[in-house]
Design a protein with these regions (language model features):
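Short, well-ordered helical secondary-structure segments
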Residues: 6, 29, 138-140
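Acidic/polar, low-complexity intrinsically disordered N-terminal segments immediately downstream
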Residues: 20-104
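Acidic/His-rich structured neighborhood in mature extracellular/periplasmic domains
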Residues: 85-186
Length: 186
């Protein structure tokens, strides 16, 4: 009986003290650095894309931007886009990968940011060591991945223009996989 009375007193106390009269106000939106990131032609396209879909396209990003996640560690690494390939990379992404989705889909299911990287990869442990005792890892390239609030396109480099048709199809498939993976995780 004592436990029951103690439990009732605790629940009653919680109920009384949880009824605050403070007005609820929304928090300020999070900012993730400067946007747009420059004044090139593609920067204006990124602003238009943001105004239309609510998605920032970033080509300068930090490790924290790439890894920002609440529940898990992202086992990938990303390198920023090569500056001379940003326009070609964005054109490829926009014309071959994003154009297949409806505007409604892009507004509802795209992440907060698209990160343009020259390379995205994971590291696989080879269980070997070099002469100095350091672990040796094998680099496993990826072309696109998604995180909690971003999609990273990892082919914005000088090699993009020289890809064969089959390599471009594979690249489009990886991006589509990342977009659908992000959309289904929402």
């Amino acid at each position: 009986m004592k436990k029951f009375i103690y439990l009732m007193i605790c629940l009653l106390s919680i109920g009384i003290y949880s009824c605050g009269e403070d007005d609820l106000t929304p928090s300020e939106p999070m900012t993730f650095g400067e946007f747009p990131q420059g004044d090139a032609t593609y920067d204006q396209e990124f602003v238009e894309f943001y105004n239309k879909y609510g998605v920032q396209v970033l080509y300068k990003f930090s490790e924290a931007d790439f890894r920002w996640n609440i529940t898990e560690y992202i086992p990938y690494y990303a390198i920023e886009a090569e500056s001379n390939s940003i326009e070609d990379g964005w054109s490829f992404l926009k014309e071959n990968c994003l154009s297949i989705w409806s505007d409604d889909f892009l507004r509802k299911f795209m992440p907060y940011r698209i990160l343009l990287g020259s390379e995205v990869y994971s590291l696989k442990d080879t269980y070997q060591y070099d002469d100095e005792g350091n672990k040796i890892y094998q680099k496993i390239p990826k072309k696109a991945i998604y995180g909690l609030n971003h999609l990273t396109f990892g082919a914005v480099n000088g090699r993009l223009s020289s890809l064969s048709v089959s390599e471009k199809k594979e690249l489009i498939g990886e991006i589509a996989f990342a977009i659908t993976g992000y959309a289904t995780s929402k």
